[in-house]
Design a protein with these regions (language model features):
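Long, charged, low-complexity intrinsically disordered regions
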Residues: 1-92
Length: 92
């Protein structure tokens, strides 16, 4: 079996987490935050949806302790369906 080359997906200032399994969301967000900072973003939006609130809670639990996160807040226009994250600036 031939190995396929990885698909390059450009990093944008938001990620929609609806297509990821709940068990994978924390790892996906962690990887995304590292890639977003490397790409030079200061603020990013994590779209987790409203639903039961479980995914939002899991995401915000990670953000509370994450070394790259300066602060985060509920995106005002999303009615609790998205979280905005301010990333720490890299040290020179």
């Amino acid at each position: 079996m031939d190995e396929q080359e990885p698909v390059h997906i450009p990093i944008e200032d938001s990620i929609d987490l609806h297509s990821f399994a709940p068990r994978d969301v924390v790892a996906v967000v962690d990887d995304y935050l590292h890639a977003a900072r490397e790409a030079g973003f200061t603020d990013v939006r994590l779209i987790h949806g409203r639903g039961t609130g479980a995914q939002r809670a899991a995401v915000q639990r990670l953000l509370r302790e994450h070394a790259l996160v300066e602060r985060y807040w509920d995106a005002p226009e999303s009615r609790l369906g998205a979280t905005v994250v301010r990333l720490r600036r890299p040290h020179p």
